[in-house]
Amino acid sequence: MPVNTLYCEGDIQSIDVQVLLKIVPNGCVVKPIGSKHGFRQRILAAREIQPNMMIAGLKDRDFDDDNSKPINTPHEWYATVKNQQVPLGWYWDRKEIENYLIAPEVVKLALGDKAPPIDKYKTALDKSARKIANYTAARIALSCVSYPNPPFNGWGDEREPGHFFPKERGLKESDCRSEIGHIIAHKKRAMDALKINILDQFEQVLEECGEGGERFKHYLTFFAGKDLLYMMRSELKKLGFKDSPQPACYVFREHIRRGIQSSSDVWTWLPEWQRLRELISEFRI
């Protein structure tokens, strides 16, 4: 029986929902639930209340300690209930929805003849990835802390609701190491000890995120799409996307969103989107 209701993060206006509505098959309702906190419980409770409905969830991958090569298909998401593995749904192969929106193939299809020259766009993406490599390594290291109430995995000014990013001059390796130190010091005042040494983790991930590292090779999977997008703002201006009044990066994203909204075959644009559509149709509990 195919999925009737697909829960996802965000709200009804979020770009996650708008993209998913273009991917899911007919008959599947996309239902945003806000924060990811309690996502598992929401799905299980909904199934108990509506036993005749097929309910599943799709969540962001976020940062994790798995640097395996991309598989271009959603990962299966399970919960352990009464000592049994129960399928909840899936999580994206890439970090978050922006990682898909800024992919060159999506940009080309969403913007059509208004798309920037793809070679120049790819150069802008590569440049952005190089600039945020250290910061990404720090965010991944902070995200690998597993105790309750882990530290916030970013810093800087709030660029849009929920997204913080430092000034460009604060992206150096030494800056990231210093910020991690401040976060560790703050947490040590609140807890007896950290369960992992975040700075050691940072050193390890730093190599993976640097040029030639496995995560850098696949930065559209492992780096934060929101960070990559924001760091491209000056390059996007050169490609014709002007501040008005939002930064050029958000103007660019809005053009992509509109292109997706006006297209009927969005689910065919990426192999992972095609596979998600299939998995929704084939889902079994």
Predicted regions, residues:
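Acidic, divalent-metal-binding catalytic cores of TOPRIM
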Residues: 1-285
